Amino acid sequence: MSSSETFYWHDYETSGADATLDRPWQFAGVRTNAALEIIGEPLTLYARPTPDRLPHPAAIRVTGITPQLAAERGLPEVAFIARIHQELAQPKTCGIGYNSIRFDDEITRFALWRSLRDPYGREWQNGNSRWDLLDVTRAYRALRPAGIEWPVREDGFTSFRLEDLTAANGIEHGAAHDAMADVVATIEIAKLLRRCDENLFDTLHRQRTKRAVSALVNLDELTPLVHVSGMFGGARHNLALVVPVAWHPTNNSDLICVDLGKSPDFLEQPTDIVRQYLFTPQAELPEGVERPPIKTIRLNRAPVLLPTQWVAGGVAESLGLDGDLHRRHLSLLREARAADQAGFMTRFQSLWQAQSFPERSD
């Protein structure tokens, strides 16, 4: 990270959990330098509720922000998001939070859209980028857990809730679900992670952009990569070895991959059957049928993708990764590729070419 680049740590409290429809009621943000030292004035804003969207009662209970409080302290949404955009759009800013790419960034995008502003430009123009500490934290738990206290849920798996991590590691958090308290707590977690393994922190930071992570992809050799994602679940340490097999046919930010921890039995099945099982909701799959181990990774969402060297030296064993099994599955995929050089990639791409989505009602 160059000396001129900065992180802008931020968090929203909202009227509900649907980022596409629910509204931001509180925002907090603060800027740090590359050393995670605060260099700007903290910013806290409220937005007035809008009459076209009722708040969810659970959101009021969790955040403690009532419609009356938001109305009293809040700005009109257009002024609210304009002030936020002013910070996030500063050149060479990396917007970051905890679960920010999946939630907070979507809140920002939709608020900008409702205000007739460009929803995306601030994420990539003028040397800007975005990052998310949640998957970084998952990567540390799997790959470099030493030096950090990892809270455990009732089901025996690690809790990645921000308030649980701060409590376990003696980090002051103030009032959880207060936007500024969450921002400060996130910065302190980042400092802890970096102290424990600066190399992993800096590596993940360098590879947060689409261009950087694309450089790891080798479709010609079918080179496997380490992928960390909450989609794999606690039983798998939120990690899998995957092999990129094709680019999405219509979205060049999406990479089609196969999970090497699962058998590639789908290679023997007709494409229409594979497609049916791939996009059928889990609860509706026939008994005894597993979803094909094929997924897309969105490279413009700062995914954690690393070379397999990161699971060398006993790390794979600690994660329960069966090297022989993974090599066997990779060999089957490479054999299928060698048998049909032209059709191998096309077959994966065709799974998404006929994809349809149910209509969404109001």
Label every PLM stretch briefly:
Residues 13-20:
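Short acidic, Gly/Ser-rich segments with clustered Asp/Glu that frequently serve as metal-coordination loops
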Residues 6, 26-28, 254-256:
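Conserved beta-strand and immediately adjacent loop positions that scaffold enzyme active sites
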Residues 206-283:
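Acidic catalytic cores of enzymes that act on phosphate-bearing nucleotides/polynucleotides
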Residues 21-27, 31-65, 86-199, 204:
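Metal-dependent phosphoesterase core characteristic of DEDDh/y 3'-5' exonuclease domains
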Residues 251-330:
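Extended alpha-helical coiled-coil/bundle linker/stalk regions that scaffold oligomerization
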Residues 9-11, 259:
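Short hydrophobic beta-strand that contains or immediately precedes a catalytic carboxylate
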